[in-house]
């Protein structure tokens, strides 16, 4: 399979992949699986691996990769800098900005990479894939909403109430994923 075919296939699987995590979580809850945490960790790791593979298979150019990496580094540095302040981390805001300006895949990558790199400072653990998934999802949804025009006005400026509402909702989304 060529990179182009793999990229198109994985692009078509993005939504089902992102929905696989809550669906498997609900199924494990209903079925009463005792090792649900391990099963969910495997599913999240698989989703992340496929998302990263899809991004790589899309063969992004340097002009697409560099802003993504710079924003991910900025988000990670901001998380480390504001570490002593509880519940104040700029990762969600930067992931939303990346998704809105660079596209949904780049928004996902910024959120996921920011969690991965900042945890080299805070410590890696079983929570790292969950943080990567949650912040990646925040950036991805920000990109989808921006592409749908949810943040745009007719005159081309940003509709701040909608952007702020999603920023608030993204904090709740992150908390639901992490605490579920």
Residue spans of the language-model regions?
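Hydrophobic alpha-helical transmembrane segments
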Residues: 65-70, 93, 108-112, 129-133, ...
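Hydrophobic alpha-helical transmembrane segments of multipass integral membrane proteins
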Residues: 70, 74, 78, 98, ...
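Interfacial aromatic-anchored transmembrane helix boundaries in multi-pass membrane proteins
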Residues: 76-92, 112-146
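Interfacial segments of multi-pass membrane proteins
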Residues: 99-104, 118-121
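Broad structural signal for hydrophobic residues in well-ordered alpha-helices, predominantly aliphatic
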Residues: 77, 97-98, 145, 177
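Structural signal for the C-terminal ends of transmembrane alpha-helices
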Residues: 48-58, 101-103, 141-150
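Membrane-embedded alpha-helical hairpins and interfacial helices in multi-pass inner-membrane proteins
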Residues: 3-42, 128-130, 144-180
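Hydrophobic transmembrane alpha-helices
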Residues: 2-97
């Amino acid at each position: 399979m060529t990179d182009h075919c793999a990229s198109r296939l994985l692009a078509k699987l993005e939504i089902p992949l992102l929905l696989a995590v809550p669906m498997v979580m609900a199924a494990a809850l209903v079925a009463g699986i005792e090792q649900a945490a391990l099963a969910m960790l495997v599913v999240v790791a698989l989703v992340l691996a496929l998302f990263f593979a899809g991004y790589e298979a899309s063969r992004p150019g340097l002009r697409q990769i560099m802003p993504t990496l710079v924003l991910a580094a900025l988000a990670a540095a901001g998380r480390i800098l504001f570490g002593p302040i509880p519940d104040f981390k700029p990762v969600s805001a930067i992931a939303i900005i990346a998704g809105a300006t660079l596209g949904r895949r780049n928004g996902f990558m910024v959120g996921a990479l920011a969690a991965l790199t900042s945890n080299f400072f805070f410590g890696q653990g079983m929570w790292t894939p969950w943080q990567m998934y949650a912040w990646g999802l925040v950036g991805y949804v920000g990109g989808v909403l921006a592409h749908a025009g949810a943040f745009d006005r007719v005159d081309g400026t940003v509709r701040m109430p909608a952007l702020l509402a999603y920023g608030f909702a993204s904090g709740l989304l992150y908390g639901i994923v992490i605490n579920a």
